[in-house]
Amino acid sequence: MPQLNSGGGDELGANDELIRFKDEGEQEEKSPGEGSAEGDLADVKSSLVNESENHSSDSDSEVERRPPPRETFEKPRDYLSEAFRRQQDAAFFKGPPYAGYPFLMIPDLGGHYLPNGALSPSARTYLQMKWPLLDSPSTAGLKDARSPSPAHLSNKVPVVQHPHHMHPLTPLITYSNEHFSPGTPPGHLSPEIDPKTGIPRPPHPSELSPYYPLSPGAVGQIPHPLGWLVPQQGQPMYSIPPGGFRHPYPALAMNASMSSLVSSRFSPHMVPPPHHGLHTSGIPHPAIVSPIVKQEPSSGNISPNLITKPSVVVKKEEEKKPHIKKPLNAFMLYMKEMRAKVVAECTLKESAAINQILGRRWHSLSREEQAKYYELARKERQLHSQLYPTWSARDNYGKRKKRKRDKQSPEMEITKTKKMCVQHLPADKSCDSPASSHGSMLDSPATPSAALASPAAPAATHSEQAQPLSLTTKPEARAQLSLSHSAAFLASKSPPSSSLSGSLSSPVGSPLLSRPIPLTSSILSPPCVFPSALQALPLLQAQPLSLVTKSSD
């Protein structure tokens, strides 16, 4: 695009600007301060054409610097036109839902010029929306070079800094210090905007967690679907008026990277989650979410009841049945008849003592006297069989056994089994004792034992140990074991000076028969062994051993 000079570029620049805004559906607002200093406007617009060619690349791949400082005689309208031109070239209007109103910027046309070449408030609002992420850690150098303090409106461009509890990716929408009434929004708003409040209606309220924008004047909490694009508390540039007003435009400020989020209709995984520092965040409390009812405890409670119910029913049926006593025998009939007499004669009232007295008297009776009671008992049995034909003595005895089983708690059964295990432990200890004795002999070889001096003692212990577990597999292995026994025998017959070597070589055979682990220790541990024992050891190492439960020959 050719450069325009200050003379004839005024008309062309103005027509080009009007055509571009008509394409985007934006109506340029006319203000009373527009008709001043035509020559200055021409110079500014010619410089804007040059800057638009330099900055026409994507705003995502490069960090745009602040515009060069202007002279103090420039007017706020110049920066307004610069803002619209740079916005259009940097692809601000990519978002399809809110293409007509990408951001809010109310120019402060009545403001005075600031000293030392500072920018007007409208330029500050443009810069703040043009670079919403200047407060990120990667731009610390820009912070240091541009603003010593975020809220101080000096001759430097103020950089936005959020409070510590706000999300770093939250672009802020700024307002000018002009108060305006909460009028109705224009008629060309998109259908998704509420005409009463001017705030976009939530398209997917169940998917998006809203923020609640609060003004210093305690504006009512209004849910917003785009919570990360709504102005939050602690905004350092321009605060919302304390009267509390409704904004007629949707609160959006998008660069090229954010327009892709708008085009994708704000899928839940792309929207940053609200930070927990805000007390008005829309994260649902865990108690509000309906929990999944776990039915495992209830099913666990039902199954024992179902199991125990039949047994309870059976017990109740048994209790309903009357207890049928067995027919009395001859002795019981005698006791029934004579018990009152014995109680009257004796001062004892214990039933055991009375029963002993009745038993002695029963045995002292003659056969004829006893026969009388046996006859009565026979008649009693006949009468009982007629009354209860299906009765059996097993019913009563079975009930007693069941009662005993119910009375016995499972703890008693556990203690019984433990006692049985303890009774078997001494036998196991007797099997383990030879290995421990051999281990002690190998650990302390300086004390020769008298039992190893006699050749018969090891053989007896070997035969006893070989019965539960014998490591014999083939006749060849048995022959090799006999060689080891002979080596131990020769070592025991050696003179007293070689008693130490005998005590070390003799345990070679016994661990072989008891356990395989002492075999390696006994082979490796003795430093000096009799030559015959050394000849037998390679044979034992070459032959593999296996566990056999059969008794040895």
UniProtKB/Swiss-Prot annotation:
Residues 324-392 bind DNA. GO terms for biological process: Wnt signaling pathway. Residues 1-77, 183-213, 392-474 are annotated as: Disordered. Residues 1-11 have a biased composition (Gly residues). Pfam families: CTNNB1_binding (PF08347), HMG_box (PF00505). Residues 17-32, 52-77, 407-416 have a biased composition (Basic and acidic residues). InterPro entries: Catenin-bd_sf (IPR027397), CTNNB1-bd_N (IPR013558), HMG_box_dom (IPR009071), HMG_box_dom_sf (IPR036910), TCF/LEF (IPR024940). Phosphorylated. Phosphorylation by csnk1e promotes binding to ctnnb1 while phosphorylation by gsk3b may reverse this effect. Residues 1-61 are annotated as: Interaction with CTNNB1. GO terms for cellular component: nucleus; transcription regulator complex. Participates in the Wnt signaling pathway. Binds to DNA and acts as a repressor in the absence of ctnnb1, and as an activator in its presence. Required early in development for the establishment of the dorsal body axis in response to maternal Wnt signaling. Belongs to the TCF/LEF family. This is Transcription factor 7-like 1.
